[in-house]
Amino acid sequence: MDSVSNLKIAVLINTPPDETDFQSVVRECFREAFASIAPTGEVDFYDPVVERKFPDASRYDLVVLSGGKIDAACSDPWVLGVLDYVRITARDLPKTKILAVCWGHQAVSRAFGGQVRPVPAGEITAIEDIRLTDAGMKFFPFAATSGSYRAIELHSGEVYTPPPGFISLAENQECFINDTNNVLTFQAHPEISHELASKLILEEDKKHSRNSSAEVLGIDRPTEGLKLLERVLQWLSE
């Protein structure tokens, strides 16, 4: 990998356009997060949905699969294109690492033989303490003492069966790394700041008229997304 100052990152925005500003919010979250931890790095965005554009992975240190508002189990042509791209990149360009979040986590699992499904209890919008496995505590030393990392979850689908050749770094199929060490996935959103996470949780609570306390909502303690992404940057050279 190049040094952090020369870091090159490609982000695939994996969501169809709609009447909201969701796509621009996704871009801004990644732009701000990487600017915080790699301010001189280069971040490029690609649209695999409408433009069907994919990065030349050989030009990048890291390819990121974003979240998205579509079923990761569907067979839309662009979804199948993302799955093929991930498989080919991981196989043919192992020096380029792949990071996948939320929908991307599910898509990667499907691409390599795992199973995804709708969340049985319905859509999840919550800040959660995600419990680590023994392997996860070794991979995320900053979280070894607590045994968990804290991040926001925003999803209606989940990984039901993990893909062969992937190691669980967190319980409940929340985080995987493959055994060739070039694909890392999170169900949670490390790119979303604590401020935005808190805003989203409060809006969801207000929508359902719960008006819960900050403690009940889980927004009283900061999320650890930047710590997770800092660990991702360290991983690029491992």
From Swiss-Prot:
Concerning CDD domains, the annotation shows: GATase1_1
Record flagged with keyword Hydrolase: yes
EC number(s) stated in the UniProt entry for this protein:
3.-.-.-
- State the top-level EC class: hydrolase
Q: Which domain of life is it from?
A: Eukaryota
Q: Reply yes or no: does the keyword Hydrolase apply.
A: yes
Q: In which pathway does it act?
A: Pigment biosynthesis
Which positions are tagged coiled coil?
none
Q: Which Pfam families is this protein grouped with? A: GATase
Q: Cellular component per GO?
A: cytosol; nucleus
Report the PANTHER family cross-referenced here: GLUTAMINE AMIDOTRANSFERASE YLR126C-RELATED
Q: What's the protein name?
A: Glutamine amidotransferase-like protein chyE
Q: Which organism is it from?
A: Penicillium rubens (strain ATCC 28089 / DSM 1075 / NRRL 1951 / Wisconsin 54-1255)
The beginning of the lineage is: Eukaryota, Fungi, Dikarya, Ascomycota, Pezizomycotina
Q: Which gene encodes it?
A: chyE
